[in-house]
Amino acid sequence: MKKRTLTFILTTTLITGLLSACGNSSTSDSVTVPSNNSSQKSEVICLTDTVAESVNIDYSINTYAPVNDFGYRLFQESLDGTTNPVLSPVSAYIALTMAGNGANGATKDEFLKLLGENGEMTTLSDDMINRFSHDTENLKLNLSNSAWIDDEFTPKQEWLNTISSLYDAQAYHANLSTSEAMDAMNQWVCDHTQGLIKKMIEKPLDEK
């Protein structure tokens, strides 16, 4: 995967029974991961403040049709009859809408074509995050989002504000081709899945 043309979006969905062990989901403004050389450390900087401004809209079932259609197509493309993948269409949809918010022109049109041409992908994602992220007596559901941006790029503040306020997302700046960045991303996933997913990324992103 090429790092120079990609902002890496991580979205996790966690469903656990309340009898399971619960970890601390809080995060600091920076994540420092030791490198193989104990005398050096690489710092991953958080670019966003955690400020959630929810948009609660009384959506009808028809409003969620783009999400349902996206989920069906995602499973259709992923199931080949020989494997049994674990997929979260909601996580994939939210991650893509986060990325789509930073696009414009023809690229933005492609995101809308994929995610539903209703012009409301941002508020729809925000509504799902707020509706679904509630604990019940026997169930805990957690949606967590983050964006990892290579340090050769400077993201627009407007996009950072959007993903922070509407997606409750954190954005991190790092050299994505380093093992330290890979370790930090894996640690983020581990922390936000209460240790159920310990390693999502097997190797650093390609520097070219």
PLM feature segments, named:
Residues 34, 38-41, 82, 125-208:
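Non-catalytic, conformational "gating/processing" segments within enzyme and secreted inhibitor domains
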Residues 23-25:
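Bacterial signal peptide processing site
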Residues 85-92, 96-103, 200-208:
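Active-site-proximal helix/loop microenvironment
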Residues 29-67:
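N-terminal low-complexity, Pro/Thr/Ser-rich intrinsically disordered segments
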Residues 1-9:
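Bacterial N-terminal signal peptides that target proteins for export
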Residues 17-21:
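C-terminal motif of bacterial Sec signal peptides marking the signal peptidase cleavage site
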Residues 49-58, 90-94, 108-113, 163-172, ...:
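Acidic/histidine-rich, surface-exposed loop or edge segments in extracytoplasmic proteins
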Residues 52, 101-133:
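Active-site-surrounding "flap" and adjacent substrate/cofactor-binding loops of secreted or lumenal enzymes
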